[in-house]
Curated annotation (Swiss-Prot):
It comes from the Archaea. Belongs to the eukaryotic ribosomal protein eL31 family. SMART domains: Ribosomal_L31e. Keywords: Ribonucleoprotein, Ribosomal protein. Gene3D superfamilies: 3.10.440.10. This is Large ribosomal subunit protein eL31. It holds the Pfam family Ribosomal_L31e. It comes from Staphylothermus marinus (strain ATCC 43588 / DSM 3639 / JCM 9404 / F1). The gene is rpl31e. One of its GO terms (molecular function) is structural constituent of ribosome.
Amino acid sequence: MSEEGKITRSIHVIPLKRVYWGRRTNRADRAVRLIRKYVRRHFKEAEKIIIDPAVNEYVWSRSREKPPRRVIVEIRFDKEEKTAKVLLIRSSKAKIMSANSK
């Protein structure tokens, strides 16, 4: 975790495998809710959680029924405004693709 004044930055790997336990028809919806729940658990002081559209697009990229198993995000927590912003670092698919190209 790095701190620059009032903003705390941290990188998290959020596992989304629990959304596969339920019905197929709303897995991406539950994945977004799980991300919000994860951030709320780790940043208890956060009153507002903002999920970047890139994170949402990545979760929905393979349709509603097949969200990714995990997502790597950077969470920026502003202590004064008590907001947590969730930003996409990279997809695990991009990490695998770059490893295969070497």
